[in-house]
Amino acid sequence: MTFSLVACDLEAGDWGVAVASKFPSVGAVVPWARGNVGAVATQSLANVLYGPEGIERLASGGSAEQVVADLTGPDDMREERQLGVVDGHGGSATFTGGDCVDWAGGRTGPCYAAQGNILTGPEVVDALVEVFLATQGTLAERMLAALLAADRAGGDRRGRQSAALVVRRDGGGYGGNNDILLDLRVDDHADPVPELGRIHGIHDLLFGKTPADEFLPIKGQLATEMTERLSRIGHASLQEWADIENLEERLDPSGKMIDPVVLRLLRETTATS
């Protein structure tokens, strides 16, 4: 009833899970991850203990294959379980119990594990893998592209209902105080994977990171333009407007530079004001 991709980007320090299902709120059950430790997807007749226990075993140095064996071995219902794991070194493993409903199976390679059950066919998992490997960009962008391709290839043969994207990076969370780089969910929607992509776009707009060398100095004509535009919409400062628009994570702490994304939004907001 679910297809998922567990993956990492070792260079960026990102670990994550992308998942879609004909099941409500799949993001509350399947995806688990921790920055610089690994990621787990537990599905089919999901044993939710696989998530936290798997992460702890990975944190203790277990490989993906070891963790899969340790979790499924003592589980009397393992033949109804499905599991994907990527460890802190990019090692991967997938498990599909013999009683998972067809089509069910998975594929692994360096830094990814793709799996699904009750699918239209193996082409769904193939699409996950092939598009993930062929796509350039951040881990989140690559996983979203793969999830959309798998959905278009047929997805869950019962239909569509929910989707989720989780990415963890040490210090990657809001304010740099945790590892929750992304935790996005579509709990009940007629077309959840494209909707997840839309929500990711909003998140990237508000919390994405523009390289510091692309920021623009607030001086001269640009400073005059910004002051006029902010005044036009009733704000005395960039900080005041940005706080209302939830753009504080994109502001330059010194107040002397502006993210070009923020400038574009200011111009769009004031275009007809």
Where are these regions (language model features)?
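A short amphipathic alpha-helical interaction element
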Residues: E214-P253, L265-T270
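DNA-contacting surface of Y-family translesion DNA polymerases
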Residues: V261
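Short, surface-exposed glycine/acidic/tryptophan-bearing loops
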Residues: G255-M257
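N-terminal nucleophile
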Residues: M1-G220
